[in-house]
Amino acid sequence: MSYQVLASSQNDKVSKIVRPTTTYQPSIWGERFLQYSISDQDFSYKKQRVDELKEVVRREVFLECYDNVSYVLKIVDDVQRLGLSYHFENEIEKALQHIYDNTIHQNHKDEDLHDTSTRFRLLRQHGFMVSSNIFKIFKDEQGNFKECLITDIPGLLSLYEASHLSYIGENILDEALAFTTTHLHQFVKNEKTHPLSNEVLLALQRPIRKSLERLHARHYISSYENKICHNKTLLELAKLDFNLLQCLHRKELSQISRWWKEIDFVHKLPFARDRIVELYLWLLGVFHEPELSLARIISTKVIALASVADDIYDAYGTFEELELLTESINRWDLNCADQLRPECLQTFYKVLLNCYEEFESELGKEESYKVYYAREAMKRLLGAYFSEARWLHEGYFPSFDEHLKVSLISCGYTMMIVTSLIGMKDCVTKQDFEWLSKDPKIMRDCNILCRFMDDIVSHKFEQQRDHSPSTVESYMRQYGVSEQEACDELRKQVINSWKEINKAFLRPSNVPYPVLSLVLNFSRVMDLLYKDGDGYTHIGKETKNSVVALLIDQIP
């Protein structure tokens, strides 16, 4: 931490401006992603081969699978985990509906743990009503999971994955998670060379439900290739599709990197975090499909501006400067730029307003109304940043409940979900934006998850400088508990938020599906970047490895 002391003169009076700045780690990527090109001929060839393989899968894999439930489960699970589900949404829906209609009311006493757990997980992932009581057949007379299950590693792993689809109050799934976690940890400790050891290790680190789809696919493709019974067509398609999408994503990142260099915030606002690559990774974790390219580009630019704004309010601007900036943001008028001081705030303000104007042009007249909702969400976010700056300026210590009224906005996830929707074109309607503007419950659950995971791992670093209290400090004071007790309670609330998000998928859902998908995937990104530390501010090994896996290394 450092304090910048600047001199300013007004009416021949000299005053000192003290800025509680901090030093952030510079970008570790340099200009690596600035330029990228692929020959049109090579891209077209790969695209043609992908299309050919998709038809083979439809003709030879899905059309042959309905008579054997175990086979259906395996194909659907493999297709999803290989990152191919967006190509076969109709086929997957039809297959799962067939499984649901033909098995949900049957007696499953003779089923093995693996198939029961896989069916449960796949159906719940897609919103089908399926009771967790089906796992009672795997318990003994004392109500404990049977000891004989301990040696069934595929079954244990499948039950472990299924347990992450639980709702609040489903004790049997909580027990299943504890049971499987204990014995799977013991397995990887004792059986390091077992064929399933690496797959179990990855699952314990991050279950399917909390994994970024592309990152999970990257790992699973390698695992799938090593399976004796793998489908060669699916494997070839998965590899080609991953590499083809990576080309598109690299091209997008190159475009975004050039924009980032052009606005030159790295030099004009040197106090802010330089994380454009990590921010693109963030959005790549939310949606990866080719048709959502515009949504990724728009959303990455906006989250980059929000990150810079966070650093302006958090670690640079004086209260007076921030007050004027916030007033200007609310007015949203380029004529306000000239009154902003210092010059870097003018620069930020102009870039912010110009970006939203460009978004309107890119979307076209019929879609431009969506930008209004994104702009209002950004205003609200920066207003929350200012409320936290006011707490610091006034030395005010909010209660935990009072804190949440502001910090569930300042976490930024409502703004980002609204912004992500504006580039999704036909997927969303004006009613969806109106519904989101009313702060529905699923957004509160998503924001709780985001805010608490962030604060648990970052509050100590933030408190090293002048900083408003986090939810951790507010919880400690309101309830008179230790830091560890506060963090433990916030973690419990994160777990409950995951369970509420799971339940929101239950059909029929009153939540628009694009919103459900965004909530789930934004939550997954939090688990990647904030589970074991602030992997965004302090670029950790996992963040770096994820960038390499998704944006640098191709699959041979």
From Swiss-Prot:
E.C. number(s) listed in UniProt: 4.2.3.57, 4.2.3.104
The keyword Zinc is annotated on this UniProt entry: no
GO process annotations (BP): diterpenoid biosynthetic process
Keyword Flavoprotein: no
Tissue expression pattern: Expressed in glandular trichomes two to four weeks after flowering onset.
Cofactor annotation remark: Binds 3 Mg(2+) or Mn(2+) ions per subunit.
Keyword line: Lyase, Magnesium, Metal-binding
Binding site residues for (2E,6E)-farnesyl diphosphate: R273, D310, D314, R451, D454
Motif (DDXXD motif): 310-314
Cofactor: Mg(2+); Mn(2+)
UniProt-annotated binding residues for Mg(2+) 1: D310, D314
GO MF, any single term: terpene synthase activity
Residues reported in the UniProt entry to bind Mg(2+) 2: D310, D314
Pfam families the UniProt entry points to: Terpene_synth, Terpene_synth_C
InterPro entries for the chain: Isoprenoid_synthase_dom_sf (IPR008949), Terpene_cyclase-like_1_C (IPR034741), Terpene_cyclase_plant_C1 (IPR044814), Terpene_synth_N (IPR001906), Terpene_synth_N_sf (IPR036965), Terpene_synthase-like (IPR050148), Terpene_synthase_metal-bd (IPR005630), Terpenoid_cyclase/PrenylTrfase (IPR008930)
Binding site for Mg(2+) 3: D454, S458, E462
Pathway of action: Secondary metabolite biosynthesis; terpenoid biosynthesis
Reaction catalysis annotation: (2E,6E)-farnesyl diphosphate = (-)-(E)-beta-caryophyllene + diphosphate; (2E,6E)-farnesyl diphosphate = alpha-humulene + diphosphate
Comment, domains: The Asp-Asp-Xaa-Xaa-Asp/Glu (DDXXD/E) motif is important for the catalytic activity, presumably through binding to Mg(2+).
Family per similarity comment: Belongs to the terpene synthase family. Tpsb subfamily.
Role noted for this protein: Involved in sesquiterpene olefins biosynthesis, constituants of cannabinoids and terpenoids-rich resins. Catalyzes mainly the conversion of (2E)-farnesyl diphosphate to beta-caryophyllene and alpha-humulene. Can also use (2E)-geranyl diphosphate as substrate with low efficiency.
Official protein name in the record: Beta-caryophyllene synthase TPS9FN
Organism: Cannabis sativa (Hemp)
